[in-house]
Amino acid sequence: MKFPADYHYTSPFRSCKYSNILHFISLLLIFSRVGLPNYIFIFLINKAANKEHRVETLLSGNSANACKLFNILKSFQHLFFFFQICTIFSISIKLVLLKSQEYGRIPAEFSIIRSEKKKKEEQ
């Protein structure tokens, strides 16, 4: 598929009213170290959401592949947004459980991370 020389695509997130939240969550995912594949995916989303970039810059000048990637991002944007929300939610649950264990609100047996005392006792 060929694009006219002056064609600038519209971002899949430009019409989404949650675009700022999506970028914030993307940054949180990068800093929470959820893995390299997610980092690459977030990089592609941020490239696609940037209004100044052309479609051809997403994948090394191959406009047919860039158009496919753009269509995939556009059709699955809400699904990806849902998965990012789920990831942030699970990270926050783990942090709450960890803090609850530190203050003695829940027993160590039910916590995600064992306390240092328990590790020393087992050794």
Swiss-Prot record:
It comes from the Eukaryota. It is found in: Membrane. One of its GO terms (cellular component) is membrane. It is a multi-pass membrane protein. The keyword Transmembrane applies. The chain crosses the membrane at residues 25-45, 78-98. Keywords: Membrane, Transmembrane, Transmembrane helix. This is Uncharacterized protein YBR292C. It comes from Saccharomyces cerevisiae (strain ATCC 204508 / S288c) (Baker's yeast). The lineage of its organism: Eukaryota, Fungi, Dikarya, Ascomycota, Saccharomycotina.
